[in-house]
Amino acid sequence: MADSVPGGHVLLAKNSDRPVSDTQPLRFLPRRTAQAGATLRLAHVEIDDVEESYAHLGGSPYWCWGHEEGLNEWGVAIGNEAMFTRDWADTVSAVKGGADRDGGILGMELLRLGLERGRTAREALDVICSLVDRYGQWGSGVVGQPPVTGGYDNSFLIADAQEAWVLETSGHRWAAKQVTTGTYAISNQPTIRTEWDRASGDLVEHAVDSGWWESAPGRPFDFARAYVDPGTPLQLSHIRLQRSRQLLGEAVGAGGVGLGQAQQVLRDHYEDTFLGGPYFNAALPDFLSLCMHSHPSDFTWGNTAGSAVFVLPKRGEGLAHLWWTPVTPCTGVYVPVFVDAGRVPGIFAAAGTAGVRACPPEHAPVDTYDEGSYWWRFRRLLDIVKGGESAWTFNENQSVVRRAFDALERQWTAELPQVEKDALALRERGEHTAMADFLAGYTESCAQQALEVLEHLVAQLSG
């Protein structure tokens, strides 16, 4: 979801839903350079590299070169969602029938390339659109699955301090809509209907030629209706999309969407609705919720693997940063992380026993617990809170976790304005190394506090 309030900061918030053991560390990637004519090998295709790629933070599945969410040194933030389209469905059908299909670029790779090559949200949009035009999207994005079961098209929220864009793609084609104020939410379905600001040149023609849209006098072309896969039930996405819209609208009506409101949206399981929340508890979900949990019957595809709120202030009004927590945000604590720090705590960037690598997901080893991984420490806490697959103890234990972690978030939220002020003062004096060290030290301090509270909770709830 994205929010832009006149006179306020742009916020972009994102939950990343992945298989239960798809470890998602948070890494800092410095600027890198490439020689003229160099190429870049991605999971399923080789593309042209560029001379200089920008530094950024990225939350990535442990096996993936690309990211589910990220923030670059210019204050551009991007999050993506899987989207199931007619182009995707036709390709799946053709491949199952024996056809060959060249690889394309994964949505997570497109996201990282946008961060590496875009100094503004609009530049990042241009980067992603040009790559979709040229290479398309095809390949597995899920560990252990081939493209026909692990592939998907993608939608993106792309924002900087000035503007935000919604980009929705289908194979080699796309439509984009600019967001200049207010709020916008996406889920795993197209949301752009009859109005957009930019699009592929043959967007309408392709749909008509494919038999997905019948032109008629006075009927405006509806991108979502034409391109959404009718074989993928919208129950997978529409309830979550509408819940996001409802919560954002309520927050706007109550004065605006701030950090706390964004975090609450990401932690939502339909509490305070006519559903009353899940029948038993969030760890035994009845529907796909915004904060997603795996179900013993596997009707959900995993857990939320990472969650972030990106804060994008105008220059001089603060520092672009994100509040990040691994695993399900309802059992996690959001820690402030600054791209200007030039690094993250080593434990943030660590996976489990498989380590961090870049390889096709079909070849990635299954990751398992390691004490040196911040992600796995929080995954272990989630398992303890649940008390087993039947999640008998989730409700009682989750309230204990929230009391402890909410206190930390309140503390850091109160401290952050002074932290930003002190960091900006160092930058104004040209002390960039000192500023980076100061910000990195602050995040390290927050991480250590979080781990101390986590270990206390583990001991308390395991007793």
Residue spans for each PLM region:
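Short, conserved catalytic/metal-binding motifs centered on acidic residues
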Residues: 12, 124, 308
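Histidine-centered catalytic/metal-binding microenvironments
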Residues: 399-463
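Substrate-recognition/cap regions that form aromatic- and gly/pro-loop-enriched pockets
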Residues: 288-424
